[in-house]
Amino acid sequence: MSKITEQVEVIVQPIMEDLNFELVDVEYVKEGRDHFLRISIDKEGGVDLNDCTLASEKISEAMDANDPIPEMYYLDVASPGAERPIKKEQDFQNAITKPVFVSLYVPIEGEKEWLGILQEVNNETIVVQVKIKARTKDIEIPRDKIAKARHAVMI
């Protein structure tokens, strides 16, 4: 996590708590010449356009007051969608028995990406049940080898 995203989380988290929203993810990226601050939010039952607009207004005010980003940027506040990121411990716990996509820093069993059902989570590893040629297999993945994890839509 970058210093900017850490600072933004500190600013945004109290706003989300006041609105009874969950701060799902903060991402600060440069695309071409433009910078984007993308904030994903959620709440019980999901967020709608009005929720995103309200959160965007509150976040914009707080960001202007605290000014943690020196360059001009576009603020994008949205729902995390069906393929929401899995980052926090509670995210992993909530994803047990659900489809996940895991991208790794280094290959495990020759693969850097795994799609399957999250079976187990502990402090050191996760276990994802994957299908390989019509057979299911449990893949144990050390958590420190996970580059990104997200919910997945399996068809």
UniProtKB/Swiss-Prot annotation:
It is found in: Cytoplasm. GO terms for cellular component: cytosol. One of its GO terms (biological process) is translation. The keyword Plastid does not apply. Pfam families: DUF150_C, RimP_N. Keywords: Cytoplasm, Ribosome biogenesis. Its main location: cytoplasm. It comes from the Bacteria. The keyword Chloroplast does not apply. CDD domains: YlxS_C (cd01734). Required for maturation of 30S ribosomal subunits. Belongs to the RimP family. NCBIfam families: PRK00092.1-2. This is Ribosome maturation factor RimP. It comes from Staphylococcus aureus (strain JH9).
